[in-house]
Amino acid sequence: MLGLAIYAERTENVAARDAARRAAEVFLSRNLFLGRHSGRVMNKEFVLLHYPLYYSYDVLGGLKAMAEIGRIRDPRCRKALDLLESKRLPAGGWPAEQRLYRVSSGVEARTDSVDWGGTSKTTPNEWVTADALHVLKAAGRA
């Protein structure tokens, strides 16, 4: 979706623009994290904040994508934005609630040689916080 949207913007390619819009509709029709018919959380991982996401998905990643393609103010982002705001820590900032990698000096699947700030339910992660503030500002909520 992001690649198609950027390509369409730079080349004015109508087919790519339409494909990006259709892809956005898949996410928006599910409020970025809810089952379209059940209204329940599709996957518990979607409502946890991670950094970095790599090839995975969470609600903040979905919101970032909507901000980048200019769809963050779509009313169907409201529940995801509310969820994000609810995760703000009392002292400010947002936590990385779960890690998708382990720090390692060797080459293994799902490892990284960088520590991206760790995970904690009570301590803000600077990367997650920067992304959350960017999204909320783009949505007119900051």
Where are these regions (language model features)?
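An alpha-helical repeat/solenoid feature that recognizes helix-turn-helix modules
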Residues: 1-79, 95-142
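TPR/TPR-like (Sel1-like) alpha-helical repeat modules
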Residues: 84-85
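Aromatic-lined carbohydrate-binding surfaces of glycoside hydrolases
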Residues: 92
